[in-house]
C-alpha cells in the first residue's frame, strides 16, 4: 500500500504544480480560464484520492468511497484544517464538471487563486511531514 500511496502523492504533487503554473497566466483569456478550471478539477480529484488512500493506509477509513465522505473523514482525523473549504471546492468542481458558464468559471478561478491553492498546499505539507 505504501508504494501506491507514494505514487498517488506524486500524482497529486504534479497536478498541483501544473495548476500553480496555470494560475500565473492572464485570466482575461477564456482559453486560460478553461485550462485553469481543468487543472483545478484534476488537482481536486488527485487530492481527495490521496486523502482516501492515506486514510486507508492508516487503517482509519473504510466507509469513504466518495469525495464528500473522504473530506469529512480527513477533517475528523486532521489531514485538513478546514472541511468547509474542501466541501466548497468539491461543489465548485461539480459545478465546472457538469455545466459551463463563463462568469461562474471566472469566479471559481478567483477562488482557486485566493483560497483553494492554499488548501492544496496545506495538504501537501501534511503529506510531506
Model-derived features with residue positions:
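Solvent-exposed interaction patches of small proteins and small membrane subunits
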Residues: 1-129
